[in-house]
Swiss-Prot record:
The gene is htpX1. Signal peptide: none annotated. Its cofactor is Zn(2+). This is Protease HtpX homolog 1. Its EC number is 3.4.24.-. It comes from the Archaea. InterPro entries: HtpX_protease (IPR050083), Pept_M48_protease_HtpX (IPR022919), Peptidase_M48 (IPR001915). GO terms for cellular component: plasma membrane. Zn(2+) binds at H131, H135, E206.
Length: 286
């Protein structure tokens, strides 16, 4: 119920933001166009956000014949978690990570990268997937996917605003200088807004998924070992430009933050500190 409320707030916020932008740069006509665009975006975010995220990473669905061990793990964990088995996807990327998506447990998917499959042991992968199925069970996946779509739209608007500022705007308000200033302000603030949206998806849900995942697998130590390896692996991974652009809007979805953090990144951290997560997991007994 809480996640559905947050999703509704996000969708309403997206509508309000787009309408305000449309009104500022295009007056009444711009506001109407922005509202219609927002309605389409809201519909798409709810029904297709999971597909958008999977397509963003070029994830491919794998069959039991292609990945028997992966399906064996998901089969067992879904049974223990008492949820329908999600679809299983693999992302061809050296970045060691995993995420879950879907609007509800009946329409869910889990995705792992080839990097994580090459890095972790069978039991560690089991620990990671138990964490992801915990997100499915806790219904975190819809709001995460919607937030990723929302952040993507805002990032797109920021890019558009930068080009508009460079070329003098697109003929909105009568005050040309004011319009250009508006574009510049939007270009600067939009990426920050996208990050704040991801922060709104509470870090506490990662602790909750760690605990629930440990209960499902009965192997908290396996997830703890996996998190340590993933933290190290992601910090040494050199992503492509496309990877970076995708991760900026969906970093909150992954089991560990795929973005390399500086001081500012640490201030706007989308995940709890990995050391704290590991400490809590190692203290668990089932």
């Amino acid at each position: 119920m809480k996640n559905m409320l947050r999703t509704t707030v996000l969708l309403a916020s997206l509508t309000g933001l787009l309408v305000l932008i449309g009104d500022y740069f295009g007056g009444t006509g711009g506001m109407i166009i922005a509202f219609l665009f927002a309605v389409i975006m809201n519909f798409g975010s709810y029904w297709y956000s999971d597909k958008i995220v999977l397509k963003m990473y070029r994830a491919r669905e794998v069959t039991p014949a292609e990945s028997p061990n992966l399906h064996r793990i998901v089969d067992g964990l879904a049974l223990k978690a008492n949820i329908p088995k999600p679809k299983v996807y693999v992302v061809d990327s050296g970045m060691p990570n995993a995420f879950a998506t879907g609007r509800n447990p009946q329409h869910a998917a889990v995705a792992v990268t080839t990097g994580i499959l090459n890095l972790l042991s069978y039991e560690e992968i089991e620990g990671v997937l138990a964490h992801e199925l915990a997100h499915v069970k806790n219904r975190d996946t819809l709001i995460s996917a919607v937030a990723a779509t929302f952040a993507g739209v805002i990032t797109m608007l920021a890019t558009w605003a930068r080009w508009a500022a460079i070329f003098g705007g697109f003929g909105g308000r009568d005050d040309d200088n004011g319009g250009i200033i508006g574009f510049i302000v939007m270009a600067v603030l939009a990426p920050l807004a996208a990050t704040l949206i991801q922060l709104a998806i509470s870090r506490s849900r990662e602790f909750a998924a760690d605990e629930e995942g440990a209960r499902i697998s009965k192997k908290p130590w396996a997830l703890a070992d996996a998190l340590e390896k993933l933290e190290y692996g992601n910090s040494h991974f050199q992503p492509s430009i496309r990877d970076v652009q995708a991760k900026e809007t969906s970093a909150h979805m992954f089991i560990v933050n795929p973005l390399k953090g500086g001081t500012l990144q640490s201030l706007f951290r989308t995940h709890p500190v990995t050391d704290e997560r590991v400490k809590r997991l190692r203290a668990m007994r089932f």
